[in-house]
Amino acid sequence: MKELSPAAPRRALHTRKIECTGYERDDGLWEVEGRLSDVRTWNQGNVNSSRPRAAGEPIHLMSLRLTLDDSFLIVAAEAVTHQAPFVDCDGINDSYLQLVGMRIQAGFTQAVKTRFRGVQGCTHITDLLGPVATTALQSINPQLSRRRAERGEPPPDEGRRPPMLDSCHGWRRGSEPAIIRWGKVGR
């Protein structure tokens, strides 16, 4: 596996972690949970926040859960601000209930950035929606494909342009993965 080249001498200042996990529920629905944390390596006074933060204590700690059906329709949403710089940051959490009824599909990330821009949302929870959406696709699509294959059904992409074709360098038209996955359509 390739690695980055050796770094110059340096010291860590800030770490942002985003972790997302996809789940298959027993009732036939799907869930994706995402969590974002920002941690600094130095003590922060109350200049930019409502209270001081010790080194290693999260400045931001937010979680998001989306519940989806097989068509990627969001049927439930929950956002929680566990820790934030300002005491009223969690006042925006219920705004993310507006995700219910939206579908994760092409244009989703731009749509949520528009819907939750500025004072209509939390920058960090909104930033979490992109990785959560990707995790939904990465979790659910393979399971739906496996189920179709077990039933002997053809892939839904057969005969038409697959949504993933030309979505990135690896899935570019004419690439080995595209040809293997989609045959003539991938050429």
Residue ranges and their predicted role:
Residues 1-30, 35-43:
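Short, Gly/Pro- and small/polar-rich lid/capping loops
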Residues 22, 38-187:
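Active-site- and interface-proximal helix/loop "cap" or "latch" segments in soluble metabolic
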